[in-house]
């Protein structure tokens, strides 16, 4: 038993380290660039590096920083306003159509930001519906366009975190505030925000990391954020050195955000003496206020999901590519790729979760899960460049021509990127299996394999399926990794939709986009249903 446990421990740690290796490939490239400055054996390469870096820092670097800061701050503010306000209304008040709107407000998660971007450009363009009806157009090809698209796409993260906190935390504080006859505004600012600020902070950090990772919306709307800049340097300017530096800076910034999150969660604890299974009783608003609350939430849902979805369906019906073989070939390729990725990722996540559970060492368990989950925190563009840098380095050393098998590398990158999603999905299932179950099983039949296959797997089957579905959909939606690492001639739905939109072929882009949205929509609705069942049980 002890010998077997040792194998699980070693295997899990080696797997976690192996999965994090490509993430640090970019830092190896940075050290190589630094080394070349002190190497006099290859003057031509040194001159090329210095020329590229000089152009990068003189003309591009400050613009990338400026655009990234403007977009990040703008998206964060817009997401906070929309997410917190709508969450507070849903958690505390009864008003017209609130149950329907509560579901609609999470549905923007089903539409990737890059799809939302070209839908709004199509609506607001000179030949679009908005210009024909109102006689003027709104220009989306600027910072404001990116902020609107990302803000309306990402606010559900804050909405979900905040709504749960508003519903269940600081019930006693709410009751005391009512007894003291606090106004609704004062209850919101003095009680609700205070009790939910930890949850709001977590949602805001997630929005910030998703903003930094975004490539499609920023690139399509012509704003040079870090992720869009990485592509611009790598493909348009053929400057791998500057692209590596920008990727490294972006990774360092993300690590800083992760540290801030860790520090905040460990240093700021707020204790409210309450029964967490209780929820705040909703209050009924006056007739006028009900109309205003309903209208406000409907406008958010309209802009974030209803309007874009209707337009995608309308454009999709006008497109005759539904009857062309190419659409089905690309769809089949994408689904098979997503299926393979989801299957491998789910199995690896299951092994890591099982190993961290039976090791019974908090330090090793934390190391295994944190290292394995690191890939999700890294922007996809930076991860893609890091993968190329690493495998080019391995090709030079071992002469394996690994880049010739770039489809395998693409799947490997997907696994690194989405392993955290699978781990978090399985974590919820393992939290429901009591440790006494493991001890009883091992006492009766001292075998970890029996525990794994006969005990945990039947209990975890629904969570394994959930993890599989989430990774499957994330893979279909992924754009930057697919653009960077997909082999020549191999296209996914996301890449095809982006290329059509970039060529201003909106009707052609609608069909692959609609398929992505419909698949994502099924998962979002299903996950919301599972969450509601858990709330009822609690």
Language-model-derived ranges and their functions:
Residues 46-57, 313, 317-323:
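A short amphipathic helical element positioned immediately N-terminal to and/or at the very start
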Residues 54-64, 136-139, 232-242, 322-333, ...:
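Membrane-interface segments at the starts/ends of alpha-helical transmembrane spans
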Residues 93, 166-196, 223, 359, ...:
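Short helix-to-coil transition segments within interhelical loops
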Residues 212-238, 477-506:
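Glycine-rich helix-loop "coupling/hinge" segments at transmembrane-helix boundaries
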Residues 242-243, 441, 509-510:
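Solenoid-repeat scaffolds in large eukaryotic assemblies
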Residues 264-296:
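Flexible interhelical linker loops that connect adjacent transmembrane helices
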Residues 270-282, 437, 530-538:
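Short cytosolic juxtamembrane segments of multi-pass membrane proteins
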């Amino acid at each position: 038993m002890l010998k077997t446990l040792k194998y699980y421990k070693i295997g899990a740690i080696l797997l976690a380290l192996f999965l994090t290796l490509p993430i640090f490939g970019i830092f190896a490239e940075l050290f190589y660039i630094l080394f070349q400055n002190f190497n006099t054996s290859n003057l031509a390469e040194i001159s090329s590096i210095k020329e590229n870096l000089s152009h990068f820092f003189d003309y591009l670097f400050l613009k990338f920083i400026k655009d990234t800061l403007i977009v990040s701050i703008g998206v964060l503010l817009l997401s906070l306003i929309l997410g917190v306000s709508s969450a507070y209304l849903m958690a505390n008040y009864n008003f017209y159509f609130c149950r329907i709107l509560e579901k609609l407000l999470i549905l923007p998660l089903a539409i990737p930001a890059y799809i939302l971007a070209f839908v709004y450009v199509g609506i607001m363009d000179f030949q679009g519906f908005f210009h024909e009806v109102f006689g003027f157009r709104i220009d989306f090809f600027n910072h404001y366009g990116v902020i609107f698209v990302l803000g309306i796409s990402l606010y559900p993260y804050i909405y979900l975190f905040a709504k749960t906190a508003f519903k269940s935390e600081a019930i006693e504080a709410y009751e005391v505030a009512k007894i003291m006859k606090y106004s609704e505004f004062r209850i919101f600012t003095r009680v609700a925000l205070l009790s939910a600020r930890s949850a709001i902070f977590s949602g805001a950090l997630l929005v910030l990391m998703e903003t930094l990772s975004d490539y499609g919306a920023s690139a399509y709307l012509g704003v040079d954020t870090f992720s869009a800049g990485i592509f611009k340097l790598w493909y348009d300017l053929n400057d791998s050195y500057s692209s590596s530096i920008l990727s490294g800076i972006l990774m360092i910034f993300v690590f800083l955000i992760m540290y801030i999150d860790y520090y905040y969660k460990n240093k700021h604890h707020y204790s409210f003496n309450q029964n967490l299974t209780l929820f705040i009783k909703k209050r009924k608003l006056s007739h006028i206020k009900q109309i205003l609350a309903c209208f406000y939430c409907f406008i958010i849902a309209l802009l974030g999901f209803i309007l874009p979805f209707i337009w995608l369906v309308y454009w999709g019906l006008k497109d005759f590519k539904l009857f062309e073989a190419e659409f089905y070939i690309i769809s089949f390729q994408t689904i098979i790729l997503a299926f393979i990725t989801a299957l491998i990722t789910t199995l690896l996540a299951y092994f890591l979760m099982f190993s961290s559970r039976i090791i019974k060492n908090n330090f090793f368990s934390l190391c295994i899960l944190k290292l394995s989950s690191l890939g999700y925190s890294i922007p996809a563009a930076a991860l893609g460049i890091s993968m190329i840098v690493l495998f080019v380095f391995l090709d030079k050393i071992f002469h394996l021509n690994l880049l010739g098998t770039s489809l395998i590398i693409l799947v490997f990158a997907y696994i690194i990127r989405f392993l955290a999603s699978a781990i978090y999905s399985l974590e919820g299932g393992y939290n429901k299996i009591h440790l006494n179950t493991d001890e009883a099983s091992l006492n009766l039949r001292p075998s970890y394999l029996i525990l794994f296959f006969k005990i945990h797997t039947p209990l975890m089957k629904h969570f394994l399926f959930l993890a599989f579905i989430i990774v499957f959909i994330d893979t279909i939606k992924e754009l930057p990794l697919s653009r960077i690492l997909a082999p020549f001639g191999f296209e996914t739905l996301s890449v095809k939709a982006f290329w059509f939109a970039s060529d201003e072929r909106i009707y052609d882009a609608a069909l692959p986009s609609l398929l992505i949205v419909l698949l994502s929509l099924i998962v979002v609705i299903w996950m919301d249903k599972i969450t509601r069942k858990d709330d009822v049980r609690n």
